[in-house]
From Swiss-Prot:
Organism of derivation: Bothrops jararaca
Protein name per UniProt: Thrombin-like enzyme KN-BJ 2
Sites carrying sugar chains: 102, 169, 250
SUPFAM superfamilies tied to this protein: Trypsin-like serine proteases
Alphabetical list of InterPro entries matching this protein: Peptidase_S1_PA, Peptidase_S1_PA_chymotrypsin, Peptidase_S1A, Trypsin_dom, TRYPSIN_HIS, TRYPSIN_SER
Propeptide residue interval(s): 19-24
EC top class, as a word: hydrolase
Amino acid sequence: MVLIRVLANLLILQLSYAQKASELIIGGRPCDINEHRSLALVKYGNFQCSGTLINQEWVLSAAHCDGEKMKIHLGVHSKKVPNKDKQTRVAKEKFFCLSSKNYTKWDKDIMLIRLDSPVKNSAHIAPISLPSSPPIVGSVCRIMGWGTISTSKVILSDVPHCANINLLNYTVCRAAYPELPATSRTLCAGILQGGKDTCVGDSGGPLICNGQFQGIVSWGSDVCGYVLEPALYTKVSDYTEWINSIIAGNTTATCPP
């Protein structure tokens, strides 16, 4: 069994805000207010995801985060005490490799969102560039998001939590999840000893390896941070040509097979 890391209506009923910084994304710590300028909070109804600002008008997230009347919040740190430079947009257009209803957890869990108007760079808002090359196994990668910070129940953090994990060989995830295909356009990342991981509510957020935006939170173990069960992230470098084509105006561009 695997867990898609989006916060659903049934889970939101268990929602409570974290009171202790020591209740650690899973195993993380509150992010520095200045280290997540490209991180977007994506909300619609009772659902929560994250996204990544890649230029003033475009955000990348996971296809399984798609929803109606989606709002994209930039410049957010504390959800209770908004930054003065917080900016909120809605999705003008959304692009997928597959229908958002037909994505698979093995492949193409990616959504490119065009905002209804550009955001302005500010103290807490700035885009991150697409990767110039694929990541290297063994890289230290940063994860971040407002998802649950407890494995026993859904406890959403008021501020994003950050943690460092390792980029692992894809074969490690195949050993953990035998149903995985021999190859896929995903990255395997985590801590084999367990304890640090993305979790429910972190879907769509970034995996930043050696300063480059390399992955999108997709799915993982039913128990976040479990030993020998790392998570899977959409491999951004495989989609840069498609992303750049869409942004350039070629809305019929096709994704890699």
